[in-house]
Amino acid sequence: MGNCAIVGINWGDEGKGRMVDLLTESYDIVIRYQGGGNAGHTVINEYGKFALHLLPSGIFRKGVVNILGNGVALDPENLWKEIEEVTAKGVPITPENLKISDRASLLLPWHRELDGLEEARLADKKYGSTKQGIAPFYSDKYQKKTIMAGELLYPEHLTEHLTDLLGWKNLTLAGVYGAEPVKVAELREWIDTYCEKIKPFICDIGAFLRKAQADGKDILFEAQLGALRDLDYGIYPYTTSSNAIASYAPVGSGLPSAKIGEVIGVVKAYSTCVGEGPFVCEMFGAEAEALREAGFEYGAKTGRPRRVGPIDIVATRYGVQVQAATNIALTKLDVLSYLDKIPVCTHYTVGSKETDEFPFPSVLDSAKPVIEYMDGWKCDISGIRKWEDLPVAAQRYVEFIEKEIGCHVGFISVGPERDSIIIR
């Protein structure tokens, strides 16, 4: 089987969780290698419907080891709440099927507070943060001002490190934002409440993965968000603060030597976007509301309405290139079944010129979409499981996307359930 990465091609919310949940039966290990609790992976299976924000989507599969790698923004409070929600539905979670890298850094309460304070300061120039503390966390990590999960196992060192960090962080909270400084006792109580609970899951992931690799175990790398939200290759500064691309997976997982054989890029059959920033193909008014309702496009974390539009071939082709995708999973094709004509953004107009190249972020604000229309199929396709049974118009839509983005579409989802999938 070999190693595989499942990544987002666009702005996130493409349906990566349902693809990981589907494919994990063929893998031994699933690793979340970046990001934090700022986005949700929706999974529907025999246990129910879940929006996973930190837990890897392989947690429902018996015999699969799930790992939170060193690249993750580890929020002990929200992780523990998520563990409780999932186990309450009958899913076993133990140190045997969930492991946390001792090199993952902790997202602390002040990271969430700073996120909210900075968004408030930016006012109408805000980035549209989910206020889960992701940007302040990664800023601190690269300043070497965080606590690593492994430090929880060495309390005598932890106390000294916390005291030093707190003095430094309060300079920002009180001095820059005028907020109340955090007290050592408050932070200690938070650690005792949440961090103590996750200690049994913390281990040397590097050693575990090196042995797994030597034993021939197959690894599935699960990304958060998508290529257009990647810190380096996305629509900066309207990005996340980590690297959501497949090439970062070995580094963020704890196994830098890992080779990725297949990269499955997940693409929604239309475009959605949460947060601020350029969104060239955005729909408005009744047309947007109809698509949003048909696809139930509301944020898994925030519940806020997603911005929607037709599939953006220019952005999707760029995402495929950045991710070096070898296969595409096209999700939510069934949502478009209500349309007589299906809009597709094939090019951009920038100034007086038409382009099929994804522009530099500063240019995107002035780019205009070139829209073409394809025939719809106007029938329920949610029960179809074979390619040849799809309406001809649906096949042509998939084949058009495949040709334009230059990558084979090997999976097509026609519903939210695990088995609502066509494999080509």
Regions found by a protein language model. Give the residues of each.
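Non-transmembrane, aqueous-exposed alpha-helical and coiled segments at domain scale
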Residues: M1-R424
